[in-house]
Amino acid sequence: LEMNPGVVAGMLAGVLLATAQTAPPAPSAPAFGNTERLESGQIASANGIPVSYRIRLLPLSSFPALPGEIVAQLSRRRCMIPQTYEAKQPENVIHGGFHAPGADDWAALCSADGTTTLYVFFAGRFDTPTALRSQPDTAWLGHDPGESVLGSAWGIATRTADQMRASPEFERVLTIDHDAIDDARLERTLTVHYDQGGKWLAITAGSDSDN
């Protein structure tokens, strides 16, 4: 059976056009950091039994007070902000005078590629943050009583200069005139980071459950 070449070309063009019109659109993933995400999986417990975990990660847009320069730095590092299993509102982005009284300083936990880092941003130097601690997202996990799924147990908070002066364990800090950073593993340990003349002191302050 012979067919006119022009007819064949027309039929092929019609098939290609129909395919182009009916093909489903390619899926589009949301831009990085624009939506809340869950990091989940299983880890081995102390007795070797697998335990499930689920860590909530909030986008930077959940923290509208963050200065744009800091948002840019965190975005470059592909950061999302991990939330503790106790969180009732966005947390783990804090503000205070961490190197001088009244300074416009910030600190944030940044989760990226399975690792969380505690960054501090000093006023006037937002483009050169300091990393105080970095560890796997799953290093510190915990849960509320009665819950079987673990969540992040890493939380940070601002400790004011007045709170520092009221605590006897900070006596070796010679001059307390500005804020510090509480760096806690919930219900277990608490480290207080204090910038003393450009050097960060890490002071163990006992169990977080005592504060």
Placement of each model-derived feature along the sequence:
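Bacterial N-terminal signal peptides that target proteins for export
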Residues: L1-M11
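Bacterial N-terminal signal peptides
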Residues: A9-T19
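Acidic, small-residue rich beta-repeat scaffolds with periodic aromatic anchors
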Residues: A20-S61, D137-N211
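Short, non-transmembrane alpha-helical segments in secretory-pathway proteins
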Residues: L58-A87
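Acidic, divalent-cation-chelating loop motifs in proteins
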Residues: V93-P101
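Acidic/hydrophobic-patterned starts of short beta strands in beta-sheet-rich repeat architectures
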Residues: A100-C110, V173, D177-I181
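Structural motif
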Residues: G114-V120, L190-V192
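Short edge-strand/loop segments of extracellular domains
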Residues: A123-T128
